Amino acid sequence: MKRLLREKIPAWFLCTIFFGLAIHAPLTVWVGAHWPDYALFVKAWKEVLLLIVLLLVVIDVTLCRQWQRWLSDRIIQLALAFALWHGVVALLVPTSGLALLSGLLIDLRFVALGVATYVFVSNYPQYRRWLLRMLGAGAVIVIGFAAAQLVLPRDVLVPLGYGPTTIEPYQTVDSNSTYVRINSTLRGPNPLGAYASTVLTLIVAYGALQWRRISHMRRWALGGMALLAALAVWQSYSRSALLAVAVGVGIVAIVRSWQSQASRRVVLWGAGAVLGCGVIVGSIGYAMDPHFIDNVILHNDPTHGPAQTSDSDRITSLQAGLTRALQQPLGTGVGSTGSASLLGNGQSLIIENHYLFVAHEIGWIGLLLLVALTTGILVKLWHRRSYWLAFGSFAGGIGLTVIGLFLPVFVDDTVSMLWWGLAALAITEDGL
């Protein structure tokens, strides 16, 4: 019975969360369309399971008398400080009940998953492979369906309940129907781009460290998955995701070149050659189809796009977010930004920068705590870069932090919980 409560149930629930993230969006839309009375509970299924896991982990730590060990851990200290600061802001700058609850879930769920996974897997490392396989299975679903959407009808998700009141089955680039942005099983093209960029970086890191040790069949499978992930990034038409891929894969390439004792001159020449090829290919592509570059890359095609593009919306959002954050250094309250703000005054305030998003809600102190926590995890991953999971999570995490400059990337549950779960597995790994 003790093993069931302290070991088996947390493992089952974490596996369910890790796999269920891949199908969370279509599941909640489908249930909401057919059984709207149960929609709210279904949306919170992973948070409910996570709360139970946290409770069981606390019980296990208490029974094992490990509090001194974990309270002296810098990652745990920063995570607790980040959570407690939310409580302080909630008292100092109160918001409505539903907005506060929604804001707490959005802000803390990925940190809670990372902490729960970190502590649980440290105590029971035999479940690390289980959890990693669940994340891998979820990635196959997300990337596989994204590839299928390249040939499926663009409204294939409508029968599940997708639409203007839930999640759009697809989007376009600045209202130009020529360029359709796919969602896969996520909440939109930008989350898909961020997710696929992380998966692609992990695959490249795995290949860079394990290529000589794996079979030819696995190499083909790895190459196929990398190609599909790259297609998913491309078809999302997310420029920030393309930048994240460049950063993540670039980190893997540069670090491996240095570790292989290649001369810096060779590395620099190689980087220059890749950049030069990119410029040449881009120039040829622009000459062949200037509308593609104008629409997808520059968002500046007057023949199709509206006068108000996503770029102009983003600039307006950044200006408003920075002004508000400077005016209210303690923040405007948990749940005052993003989708949670709809539950307060009924008006959603969107800030297209994750760091300004956090500063707007919980102030500059809250932002510093999040940056310190994320940096601490990245440092741990860097120190374990000889293992592919840690190396890939580090490079992918840097890519996501770059996306955060343009989008509130960690607001999306699937993307945020994917990376924080991966990072937790990686900083406890022993050579997967």
Residue ranges and their predicted role:
Residues 1-6, 11, 267, 271-280, ...:
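A juxtamembrane structural motif centered on a specific transmembrane helix
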Residues 26-27, 293-294, 298-362:
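Long extracytoplasmic/lumenal interhelical loops at the membrane interface
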Residues 184, 188-190, 230-232, 317, ...:
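A conserved mid-to-late transmembrane alpha helix and its immediate loop/hinge
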